[in-house]
Amino acid sequence: MSVVHKACLIALLFVSSGVAQQCMDSASDCAANAGSCFTRPVSQVLQNRCQRTCNTCDCRDEANNCAASINLCQNPTFEPLVRDRCQKTCGLCAGCGFISSGIVPLVVTSAPSRRVSVTFANNVQVNCGNTLTTAQVANQPTVTWEAQPNDRYTLIMVDPDFPSAANGQQGQRLHWWVINIPGNNIAGGTTLAAFQPSTPAANTGVHRYVFLVYRQPAAINSPLLNNLVVQDSERPGFGTTAFATQFNLGSPYAGNFYRSQA
């Protein structure tokens, strides 16, 4: 990658407040109407029209009417039933605490509807904000999600609390970045930033480490990313939403996170 191309990439993606181009869908306006994906009867129209356009409204469930039951996700009586019945069809009730923990809107603008399964050595599981030690997360984990074998996905892991929980002015620190993943076979994707374990510095408070998966509308083939290898000095300041917007990835498909401190 030339110096010019790499400078362009950094300007586009590694400035979290930067402005990236919007979803290229002028006909159906799917991105603007994404908030109605789960509102009947409009949702049925949007689901059929927009599923592949901007990766919005990917819920295609007619039998269980899961989309209409989304308001029950916070109801202690009905949530277990809704989650059991609808998790696999529409990924509902899987917000994973992204809003209450502040990941929305700091990292992404909406919570993913599915959960990423993240397992470190000795069967240590990431579970929606649980606290893990640096020793427990020292090695690259096994990461899987509900994937379609013919689709391509992007995996991102970031720390939005860098350099410290009280002072995250440098933006998100990139810990892992793989694009064009077939299904959930991460080894078959293109690694732009190799996995880097979370090692928060002493006296910097509790850090959130966020895993995000985006479903790609097509393979990502951009001169900005060809032959890119992100250096350690370039990891701070990554913009997850800027990247997703630049490549029309829509909302995050799946996610999870844990907390850790020195």
Curated annotation (Swiss-Prot):
Disulfide bonds join 23-57, 30-50, 37-54, 59-93, 66-86, 73-90. Keywords: Disulfide bond, Lipid-binding, Repeat, Secreted, Signal. Residues 23-57, 59-93 form the ShKT domain. It comes from the Eukaryota. Coiled coil: none annotated. SMART domains: ShKT. GO terms for molecular function: lipid binding. InterPro entries: PEBP, PEBP-like_sf, PEBP_euk, Phosphatidylethanolamine-bd_CS, ShKT_dom. It is found in: Secreted. Residues 1-21 form the signal peptide. Gene3D superfamilies: PEBP-like, ShTK domain-like. GO terms for cellular component: extracellular region. SUPFAM superfamilies: PEBP-like (SSF49777). It holds the Pfam family ShK. Its main location: secreted. Binds phosphatidylethanolamine. Belongs to the phosphatidylethanolamine-binding protein family. This is 26 kDa secreted antigen. The gene is TES-26.
